[in-house]
Regions:
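Short alpha-helical elements
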Residues: 1-188
Length: 188
């Protein structure tokens, strides 16, 4: 775990240096540390960023702590760097995938429960309401379509409205995969 945390920080820090990204002179945590907290939360704390912040602070990985609201604002400012990091890691995974076999699957991202749909401010269209057969429930939100290698390493993703089927969502999406690549998916 220790080496993974240090590796994540080094990747984030090198990416920001490569992009000539500058931190504010008054900030107590660098943007690389903000990105590291978010990634460590996803890797080890099931997305719980408060627990990851507390853990990294107690273990001495980060020197200063900031409030939850300040952390969320800072995290929103580096969202484009996360996409760049994901794309770079995806390109590396594609280069190492000698089999050229990829798996495509989708999973729902529920914005709210069914009884709160009328009050939802993010999405107001019926295209976002769909049925999730595996859990036997309706959801309201988006679907994330992931392209992964045989080992499960994500290389690409795209979002679509929840009611859009997987096959219909593939039409406008242009894969950035090698020409001889095989894409395997289910019929859902």
């Amino acid at each position: 775990m220790d080496t993974h945390i240090v590796l994540v920080y080094c990747l984030c820090d090198d990416l920001l240096k490569w992009q000539h990204h500058r931190n504010d002179s008054q900030c107590m945590l660098s943007d690389a540390e903000i990105m590291t907290i978010a990634i460590v939360a996803a890797m080890y704390f099931h997305g719980n960023q408060a627990m990851a912040r507390l853990f990294l602070s107690e273990q001495g990985y980060i020197k200063h702590t900031i409030s939850r609201s300040r952390f969320c604002r800072r995290l929103a400012k580096v969202r484009h760097q996360f996409l760049t990091l994901f794309n770079l890691l995806g390109e590396m995974a594609k280069a190492q995938n000698a089999d050229n076999i990829y798996i495509l699957d989708s999973l729902p991202i529920a914005v709210c429960d069914t009884y709160r749909i009328r009050r939802c401010q993010l999405y107001r269209d019926e295209a976002y309401r769909s049925y999730q057969a595996s859990k036997r429930r309706y959801f309201y939100g988006l679907k994330i379509h992931l392209v992964v290698t045989k080992t499960g390493t994500p290389v690409e993703f795209f979002l679509s409205p929840g009611a859009l089927s997987d096959t219909a969502a593939l039409d406008p999406f242009d894969f950035d995969l090698p020409p001889e690549a095989w894409i395997v998916g289910d019929k859902a």
